[in-house]
Curated annotation (Swiss-Prot):
The protein's Enzyme Commission number: 3.4.25.1
Catalytic machinery residues: T66 (nucleophile)
Family listed: Belongs to the peptidase T1B family.
Main location, first listed in the record: cytoplasm
Subunit comment: The 20S proteasome core is composed of 14 alpha and 14 beta subunits that assemble into four stacked heptameric rings, resulting in a barrel-shaped structure. The two inner rings, each composed of seven catalytic beta subunits, are sandwiched by two outer rings, each composed of seven alpha subunits. The catalytic chamber with the active sites is on the inside of the barrel. Has a gated structure, the ends of the cylinder being occluded by the N-termini of the alpha-subunits. Is capped by the proteasome-associated ATPase, ARC.
Gene designation per UniProt: prcB
The name this protein goes by in its record: Proteasome subunit beta
Length: 294
């Protein structure tokens, strides 16, 4: 149990902040003291229309991140994402980072409005670090999932204007009974509902339908890390093959999917050398097969 602490006071004796349940939440602290810094409040609001002056929907005015996939494997879990961001029918960026380590045993991928999503995930990482510093212990994985759900729910106003954020959270559950199956995947909807994905794999974003269809055929819950990573990259390749908003491996520019693996040893960014080698191998194999999957 956290010990009771006295309130902080300013020089004139005015009580400014009472240590309590909200102090361990950096997001709630911002909401009370600087709400304009929250991701959902850093956009302009339209009172009557969701269209901009050029007739574009508000959701098309900002770059959107697209496809993220997650897989559990024996002893861990991984998260991978493509690099493309789109703005309407245009490619806004070819090398966006969509996969982030949020603490030692968790990572989050983003789909939706890129600017808001990136700020939200970075704030989530600060939230976890802040909690650990204040309370002296890490949040459990369920606690992390609930915190992120609350933050996504806070973006509902922006989502109603077409600026939705849909993260995908993965982590290694230190409280799991079976270390071989301690990897966990949690998905969210735009109103902050959280859903445990127990199939062992999941995908979000515009290419998620194609990525999940690919994973359904090649995923194995008892695969090792390298096999799972290959499956993730291959599913992103299949998603890019059918979804114009998902970027496949770009051999010309040297742009490849990014990935994070999480095991009992912690979260690690997969090196570009590893992802590029796997991507090139997959492209070569598909070329030999005339573009078809094996």
């Amino acid at each position: 149990m956290t010990a009771d602490r006295p309130a902080l006071r300013t020089g004139d004796g005015e009580t400014r902040l009472s240590f309590g349940s909200n102090l361990s939440s950096f997001t709630e602290y911002l909401r009370g003291h600087a709400p304009e810094l929250l991701p959902e409040n850093r956009i302009g609001h339209r009172s009557h229309s969701t269209r901009g002056g050029d007739g574009m929907e508000s959701g098309d005015l900002a770059p959107h991140g697209t496809t993220i996939v997650a897989l559990t494997y024996k002893g861990g879990v991984l998260l991978a994402g493509d690099r493309r961001a789109t703005q309407g029918n245009l490619i806004a960026s070819r090398d966006v980072e969509k996969v982030y380590v949020t603490d030692e045993y968790s990572a989050a991928g983003i789909a939706g409005t890129a600017g808001i999503a990136i700020e939200l995930v970075r704030l989530f990482a600060v939230e976890l670090e802040h909690y650990e510093k204040i309370e002296g212990v890490q949040l459990t994985f369920d606690g992390k999932a609930n915190r992120l759900a609350s933050m996504v729910r806070g973006n509902l106003g922006a989502a109603m204007q077409g600026l939705a954020v849909v993260p995908l959270l993965v982590g290694y559950d230190l409280d799991a009974d079976d270390e071989a199956h301690a990897g966990r995947i949690v998905s969210y909807d735009v109103v902050g509902g959280r859903y445990e994905e127990r199939a062992g794999y999941h995908a979000v974003g515009s290419g998620s339908l194609f990525a999940k269809s690919a994973l359904k055929k090649i995923y194995s819950p008892d695969s090792d890390e390298e096999t799972a990573l290959r499956a993730a990259i291959e599913s992103l390749y299949d998603a890019a093959d059918d979804d114009s908003a998902t970027g496949g491996p770009d051999l010309t520019r040297g742009i490849y999917p990014t990935a994070v693996t999480i095991t009992q040893a912690g979260a690690v960014h997969v090196s570009e050398e590893t992802t590029s080698e796997l991507a090139r191998r997959i492209v070569a194999e598909r070329t030999e097969e005339g573009g078809s999957a094996r």
